[in-house]
Amino acid sequence: MRGSILIITLLIISVLVVTVTETMRRMQVEQASAAIYVSTARGRAVNRSAQALVAYLLAQDRKDPEDTGKGTADHYGEPWALFPDQDQVDLPPLPDGALNATVVDEQGKFPINSLVTEDGAWSEPHRQTLVNLLGSPPFSLPREKLEMIMPRIKDWLDTDSNPSGVHGAEADTYALEEGRISCRNGPLLFAGELAFIQDMPGKIFKQTDDRPGLLDLISVHTRGAININTARPEILAAMVNPDIPRETAREFASTMAAYRRDPMHYDFLSEPDWYRNRMAGYNDVQLPAELVAVSSDIYALMLRADIGGIQTSRYIVLRRKISKGTITFDPVHKETE
């Protein structure tokens, strides 16, 4: 009898131990899930607040009495570009986290959708700039490859169904390959869409630690001119007339980038020809006037909050609009958080 009671007691204790252990495990899982949920919600709130602060800095940039009208300049020495490490707005501390933010001027990139005019013809300054860009480091595509892919880029962008020369490719060409996306015959919706164009070399899209990929240098959100105050050296060199040796063009671009970084030169960056009138050594270099801008209104925000060890990200492209003294921001593109 005593043995039976002992066995029953041990069984009861075993059941209780298992029950308590499982209950504690479930409580720990629920606590961890709750912590993740709270950290994620806080991270998203931090990112949205950061977006509002960047918009405020961009608005203040236009309200500056010395920075209005056609003489306005936008460059990476301004508070909006330095966010969150700027001194115009005091940010509250994040005791259990951190905020990383990058604000990129989209108008400092090549406006890929400006390659073709509304009537389906090449925009020659844009065409030549893209040829220069793809034919120079870090891409260095040979002339034969450029002669093949440039008509196919045009056919992807223009609205007609007529192939551009012997190397053109319209919908009929893409239909020959099973599973291939057909020719859009319209503006690119996202930069990566270039990879769908027939015979586009994949290597030009690859980014490394020491060089950009093509997707870092082009924008589907802008049209027309390029902000020479924020364009990367690869873009600046590509804007130089092809009659100028490419090595000279790259040296010119590097000199431009160094000049505009110097705070002593910020006041000159509102001049469209500052690279000729203010920067020594390159008076013979003239960038296409229709491609030159010194201000911008479209910005990409890449925000990442790390709260309690949980990271949340937010990517959005904003367009700054000024109407009757009122500054507003419209989302051009937004990725899911």
For each predicted feature, which ranges?
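Compositionally biased linear targeting/interaction segments
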Residues: 4-337
